[in-house]
């Protein structure tokens, strides 16, 4: 533990929202995992995760009453939280509205913050939809989560509204790998981590945006880079003025590959970057590091980066997802 802040034993709960109902859960929530790992390992925080997205079974997600029961039992088992962080894409607004009411009923004195895609898109306007919130966190949360936890620990925030603006750590290699054991079991003993690992992250059977047919038995996912240097008008990053790109080194990425292979016994890894192939040197450096691991993996890239694809294939890449944003040249311009 390396901290000048006294956050030891602070109870923090991250709640991840459900996404599409038609696909089984196969993409572990990297944001909550990274933040919870950081708070626990570096600051001694008692950080836990409630992953509502893990309960999409047989074409349905949790009902509101089921979510209430799950959150209630989690709070009883781990203690009332000082801080609750909601996380989800912009499509999760209705869920966040409902969960915020549940949290406020069960833990009236908790500091309640929303972060992630929805919060970054709406900013302070999110308070209009979710008045129960004490704070809205914009951008990346690696650094500001400590500030948020410190604010939650004090009692000066009552009746106040906070907007936090997150930046990106200068060295992405310094961020601890997400500890997937935070998802190992829920409060009822359900083995969520094994459920995720057993569901293919991509491929025809995943029933998500990928239609390619290939086989995997155990798969995990993580992120190796953030942002994008391009400024495409049709992309949400361009619309938000985000052109800040950062990537972990090839060596750091290879270490996480090894960890997942050895610890979780996976035969496929999904690197869920927005755009993996931007850095040519990193792709070149990866080949001798990943090739001996004999692991299949997939990621996202642009079609005009196809020069990198043979190198990626040599390193074990068997799947590349790309977005057909528009068939109109004028829109793409």
Q: Which positions does each model-derived feature cover?
A:
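Cofactor-binding loop segments of dinucleotide-utilizing enzymes, especially the Rossmann-like FAD-
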Residues: 15-17, 52, 115-117, 274, ...
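Structural motif
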Residues: 11, 82-83, 268
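Glycine-rich beta-alpha loop elements in corrinoid/cobalamin-binding modules
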Residues: 38, 42-179, 183
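N-terminal [4Fe-4S]-dependent radical SAM core
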Residues: 1-13, 18-20, 154, 158-221
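Conserved beta-strand positions
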Residues: 14, 86, 114, 138, ...
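Radical SAM [4Fe-4S] cluster-binding motif and immediate context
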Residues: 181-333
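Glycine- and acidic-residue-enriched helix-capping/strand-helix junction motifs
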Residues: 22-32
């Amino acid at each position: 533990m390396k901290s000048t802040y006294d956050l030891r034993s602070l109870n923090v709960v991250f709640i991840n929202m459900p996404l599409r109902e038609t696909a089984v859960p196969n993409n572990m929530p990297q944001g909550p995992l990274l933040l919870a790992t950081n708070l626990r390992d570096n600051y001694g925080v008692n950080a836990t995760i409630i992953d509502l997205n893990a309960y999409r079974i047989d074409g349905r997600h949790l009902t509101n009453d089921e979510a209430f029961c799950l959150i209630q039992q989690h709070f009883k088992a781990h203690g009332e939280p000082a801080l609750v962080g909601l996380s989800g894409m912009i499509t999760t607004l209705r869920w966040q509205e409902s969960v915020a009411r549940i949290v406020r009923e069960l833990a009236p004195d908790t500091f309640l913050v929303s972060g992630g895609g929805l919060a970054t898109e709406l900013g302070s306007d999110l308070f209009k939809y979710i008045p129960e919130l004490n704070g809205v966190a914009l951008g990346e949360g690696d650094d500001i989560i400590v500030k948020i936890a410190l604010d939650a620990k004090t009692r000066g925030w009552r009746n106040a509204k906070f907007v936090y603006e997150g930046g990106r750590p200068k060295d992405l290699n310094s961020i601890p790998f997400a500890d997937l054991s935070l998802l190992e079991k829920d409060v009822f003993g359900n083995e969520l981590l094994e459920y995720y690992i057993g569901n293919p992250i991509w491929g025809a059977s995943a029933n998500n945006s990928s239609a390619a047919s290939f086989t995997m038995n155990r798969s995990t996912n993580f992120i190796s880079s953030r942002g994008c240097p391009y400024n495409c008008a049709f992309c949400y990053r361009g619309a938000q003025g985000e052109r800040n790109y950062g990537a972990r080194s090839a060596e750091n990425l290879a270490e996480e590959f090894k960890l997942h292979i050895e610890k979780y016994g996976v035969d496929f890894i999904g690197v869920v970057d927005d755009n993996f192939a931007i850095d040519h040197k990193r792709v070149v450096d990866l080949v001798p590091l990943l090739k001996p691991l004999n692991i299949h993996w997939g990621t996202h890239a642009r079609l005009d980066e196809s020069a990198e694809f043979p190198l990626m294939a040599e390193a074990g890449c068997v799947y590349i997802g790309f977005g057909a944003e528009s068939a109109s040249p004028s829109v793409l311009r």
